[in-house]
C-alpha cells in the first residue's frame, strides 16, 4: 500500500498550547525499537505508525516547506524524552516548548518554515514538494491542510491525479461534508462515488503524538474503504472509531468540550426524568429539544459573547435545583457552581 501524506505539520502551535506532549510517539518508538519516532508529530507520527505497526510499505510526504526552512531541532536526545515520558512528561516538555518558542520567533510559518525534531527521511519516508507526484498511484491520501477556505485551491492542483478507488482523508481543519464538496464541485457526484473516490477522515481528535486514537467519518466512502481504514487505524493508532460524518466536528474539534458537557447533560436528564419521574421518553425528548433549540436560537440572535445580557445564568439556580436528583445529581452540583460564579 502506498500512503501519500500531504502536509508535514509544524510543532509551534502544539508547543504554544502548553499542554501537549509526546506520549503516543514515545510509546510507538519503544514498541518498534526506533527512538527517532519519539519526537515525531502531526502526520509524521501517524505515518510512522502506519509504516511500523500496520505494514504500509511506501510513505511519501509532500509539502512545499521542504524547499524552504524545514527546521529540525536536535537539542534533545530521543532516549531522554522517552524516559521522561515514562514518569512525567512535564519533566522535559517545558524545555522543549521553550526551545520551540525561541526558534519560532525567527522562523516563518508554514509553508515557508516548519519545526520538527526528526526528518521524515530518517524514518524511511520519501519527501517531495509536489502533491501530484505524491498522490500518483497512492491508495491512501492523508491530507493535513490549512483552514478550510484554502483547501479547494490546493486540492484542485492534484485532484485529477488521484487513482480510482483511493481513500482521501482530512483532519481537524475542515468538516467532512465540506471536504467532500470540494471534490464534488470539481467533478460531480459521478466521479466522487465510492468506486472512484472514497472521502472520509483520519482525524486524531487530539495532537497525534500525544494520544493513540483516530476518528473515521462515514457517509462519503464505501463500506469496504471504511473498514479498510478502520483496520489500519486500529493497528496504527491503537483505538479507532467510526461515526457519522456530521458528528465528526462536534466530537473531535475544539467544540468537543461543549459536546461532552451537552451529551452528558442529555443522558443524565433523560435517566432522571424517565427512570425517577416515570416520564415517557417522547415527552423527555420534546423538552430536551426545546432546551437545546432555544439556547441555540439565543446564541444566534445575540451572539455567544452577549448571552448573559439576555439570560442571567443565575436564573437557572432556582429552577434546575429542583431536578437535582437521580442521574442529574451526578453533574448538576458542579453546574450550579459555574452558574453561581457567572450570575449577575
Swiss-Prot record:
<dbReference type="InterPro" id="IPR008927">
    <property type="entry name" value="6-PGluconate_DH-like_C_sf"/>
</dbReference>
<dbReference type="GO" id="GO:0019386">
    <property type="term" value="P:methanogenesis, from carbon dioxide"/>
</dbReference>
<dbReference type="InterPro" id="IPR036291">
    <property type="entry name" value="NAD(P)-bd_dom_sf"/>
</dbReference>
<dbReference type="InterPro" id="IPR055205">
    <property type="entry name" value="HMD_N"/>
</dbReference>
<keyword id="KW-0554">One-carbon metabolism</keyword>
<keyword id="KW-0484">Methanogenesis</keyword>
<keyword id="KW-0560">Oxidoreductase</keyword>
<dbReference type="InterPro" id="IPR004889">
    <property type="entry name" value="HMD_C"/>
</dbReference>
<comment type="pathway">
    <text>One-carbon metabolism; methanogenesis from CO(2); 5,10-methylene-5,6,7,8-tetrahydromethanopterin from 5,10-methenyl-5,6,7,8-tetrahydromethanopterin (hydrogen route): step 1/1.</text>
</comment>
<dbReference type="InterPro" id="IPR010062">
    <property type="entry name" value="HMD"/>
</dbReference>
<dbReference type="Pfam" id="PF03201">
    <property type="entry name" value="HMD"/>
</dbReference>
<comment type="function">
    <text>Catalyzes the reversible reduction of methenyl-H(4)MPT(+) to methylene-H(4)MPT.</text>
</comment>
<dbReference type="Pfam" id="PF22616">
    <property type="entry name" value="HMD_N"/>
</dbReference>
<dbReference type="GO" id="GO:0047068">
    <property type="term" value="F:N5,N10-methenyltetrahydromethanopterin hydrogenase activity"/>
</dbReference>
<dbReference type="GO" id="GO:0006730">
    <property type="term" value="P:one-carbon metabolic process"/>
</dbReference>
<dbReference type="InterPro" id="IPR024190">
    <property type="entry name" value="METHMP_Hmd"/>
</dbReference>
<comment type="similarity">
    <text>Belongs to the HMD family.</text>
</comment>
<dbReference type="InterPro" id="IPR038182">
    <property type="entry name" value="HMD_C_sf"/>
</dbReference>
<protein>
    <recommendedName>
        <fullName>5,10-methenyltetrahydromethanopterin hydrogenase</fullName>
        <ecNumber>1.12.98.2</ecNumber>
    </recommendedName>
</protein>
Amino acid at each position: 500500500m502506498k500512503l501519500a501524506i500531504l502536509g508535514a505539520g509544524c510543532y509551534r502551535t502544539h508547543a504554544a498550547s502548553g499542554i501537549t506532549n509526546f506520549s503516543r510517539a514515545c510509546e510507538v518508538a519503544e514498541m518498534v525499537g526506533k527512538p527517532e519516532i519519539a519526537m515525531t508529530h502531526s502526520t509524521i507520527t501517524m505515518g510512522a505508525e502506519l509504516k511500523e505497526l500496520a505494514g504500509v510499505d511506501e510513505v511519501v510526504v509532500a509539502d512545499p516547506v521542504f524547499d524552504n526552512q524545514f527546521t529540525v531541532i536536535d537539542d534533545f536526545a530521543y532516549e531522554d524524552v522517552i524516559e521522561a515520558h515514562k514518569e512525567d512528561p512535564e519533566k522535559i516538555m517545558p524545555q522543549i516548548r521553550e526551545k520551540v518558542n525561541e526558534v519560532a520567533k525567527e522562523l516563518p510559518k508554514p509553508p515557508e518554515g516548519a519545526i520538527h525534531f526528526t526528518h521524515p527521511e530518517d524514518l524511511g519516508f520519501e519527501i517531495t514538494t509536489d502533491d501530484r507526484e505524491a498522490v500518483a498511484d497512492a491508495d491512501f491520501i492523508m491530507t493535513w491542510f490549512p483552514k478550510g477556505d484554502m483547501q479547494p485551491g490546493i486540492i484542485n492542483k492534484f485532484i485529477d491525479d488521484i487513482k480510482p478507488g483511493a481513500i482521501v482523508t482530512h483532519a481537524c481543519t475542515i468538516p467532512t461534508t465540506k471536504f467532500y464538496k470540494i471534490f464534488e464541485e470539481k467533478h460531480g457526484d459521478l466521479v466522487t462515488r465510492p468506486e472512484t473516490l472514497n472521502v472520509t477522515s483520519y482525524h486524531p481528535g487530539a495532537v497525534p503524538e500525544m494520544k493513540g486514537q483516530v476518528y473515521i467519518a462515514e457517509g462519503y466512502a464505501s463500506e469496504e474503504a471504511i473498514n479498510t481504514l478502520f483496520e489500519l487505524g486500529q493497528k496504527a493508532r491503537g483505538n479507532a472509531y467510526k461515526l457519522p460524518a456530521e458528528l465528526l466536528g462536534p466530537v473531535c474539534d475544539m467544540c468537543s468540550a461543549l459536546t461532552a458537557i451537552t451529551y452528558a447533560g442529555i443522558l443524565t436528564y433523560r435517566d432522571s426524568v424517565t427512570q425517577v419521574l416515570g416520564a415517557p421518553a417522547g415527552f423527555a425528548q420534546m423538552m430536551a429539544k426545546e432546551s437545546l433549540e432555544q439556547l441555540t436560537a439565543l446564541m444566534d440572535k445575540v451572539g455567544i459573547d452577549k448571552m448573559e445580557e439576555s439570560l442571567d445564568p443565575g436564573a437557572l439556580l432556582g429552577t434546575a435545583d429542583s431536578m437535582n436528583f437521580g442521574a442529574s445529581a451526578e453533574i448538576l452540583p458542579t453546574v450550579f457552581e459555574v452558574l453561581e460564579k457567572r450570575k449577575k
